[in-house]
């Protein structure tokens, strides 16, 4: 039995075996010739018992001129490359496998960005947060002006009537300055307005009509009439007292 090159070229510490002479005396080992690394002294292909797997690089000659060739070793357990600690070294004529390429170094700009903002989410996952609408955005904030403000609805905006709506309302006001409830509902449905809007428009239009025709206000006339009646009632007793005073004066002169 020929000693394999695995035991000779291994980097492990040699175990405590008996000297080589004892093996020679016992007939375990034959004489080693010049074709030690070749396959000339071996009758068939020999595969050493490899402890670590060897990747399949194709059938390559193991020796430098022997007829025998070595096939790939079957994979076992660990996955270290040959030639490492405890691995099988290549023969002088066998090409060495190329070492794996190192990973590409990251760009300095990208690394600086990643270190400066570690909490930044990936570009593909953008978070969409719903907009928060607070109560003070919905209502008029006047608590600082009026402390008794309870947060009611803001003042209603003015109604913008269209040209067609104003034309129809003016036509109706030309014939009837006062509307009945039934007629007001009909106009509201026709012009797509509310009954309250029709009522307010007619009130404002009547005030404008009175101002254009210079008619006295009914409230002003009632107040002026009441004041004139009170003045007349106060002056009447004084006029009645004057003749009585004159009669009394004549009576005194006659005496």
Swiss-Prot record:
GO cellular component: nucleoplasm
Cited CDD domains: homeodomain
InterPro entries xrefs: Antp_homeobox_Deformed_sf (IPR050609), HD (IPR001356), HD_metazoa (IPR020479), Homeobox_antennapedia (IPR017995), Homeobox_Antennapedia_CS (IPR001827), Homeobox_CS (IPR017970), Homeodomain-like_sf (IPR009057)
Keyword field contains Transcription: yes
SUPFAM superfamilies for this protein: Homeodomain-like
Low complexity composition bias: residue spans: 222-234
Molecular functions per Gene Ontology: DNA-binding transcription factor activity, RNA polymerase II-specific; RNA polymerase II cis-regulatory region sequence-specific DNA binding
Biased composition (Pro residues): 94-107
Localization per Swiss-Prot or TrEMBL: Nucleus
Motif Antp-type hexapeptide: chain residues: 133-138
Role: Sequence-specific transcription factor which is part of a developmental regulatory system that provides cells with specific positional identities on the anterior-posterior axis.
Name listed for the protein in its UniProt record: Homeobox protein Hox-D4
């Amino acid at each position: 039995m020929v000693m394999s090159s695995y035991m000779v070229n291994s980097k492990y510490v040699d175990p405590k075996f008996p000297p080589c002479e004892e093996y020679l005396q016992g007939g375990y080992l034959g004489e080693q010739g010049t074709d030690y690394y070749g396959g000339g002294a071996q009758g068939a292909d020999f595969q050493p018992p490899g402890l670590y797997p060897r990747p399949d690089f194709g059938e390559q000659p193991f020796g430098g001129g022997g007829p025998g060739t070595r096939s790939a070793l079957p994979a076992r357990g660990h996955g270290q490359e040959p030639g490492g600690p405890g691995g099988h070294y290549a023969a002088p004529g066998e090409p060495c496998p190329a070492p794996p390429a190192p990973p590409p170094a990251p760009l300095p700009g990208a690394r600086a960005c990643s270190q400066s903002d570690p909490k930044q989410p990936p570009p593909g996952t953008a978070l969409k947060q719903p907009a928060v609408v607070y109560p003070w955005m919905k209502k008029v904030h006047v608590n600082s002006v009026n402390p008794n403000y309870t947060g009611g609805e803001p003042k209603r905006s003015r109604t913008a009537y269209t040209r067609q709506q104003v034309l129809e309302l003016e036509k109706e006001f030309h014939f009837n300055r006062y509307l009945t409830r039934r007629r007001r509902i009909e106009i509201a449905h026709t012009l797509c307005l509310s009954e309250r809007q029709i009522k307010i428009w007619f009130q404002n239009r009547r005030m404008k009509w009175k101002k254009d025709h210079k008619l006295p206000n009914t409230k002003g006339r009632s107040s002026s009439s009441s004041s004139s009646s009170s003045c007349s009632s106060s002056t009447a007793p004084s006029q009645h007292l004057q003749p009585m005073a004159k009669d009394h004066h004549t009576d005194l002169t006659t005496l």
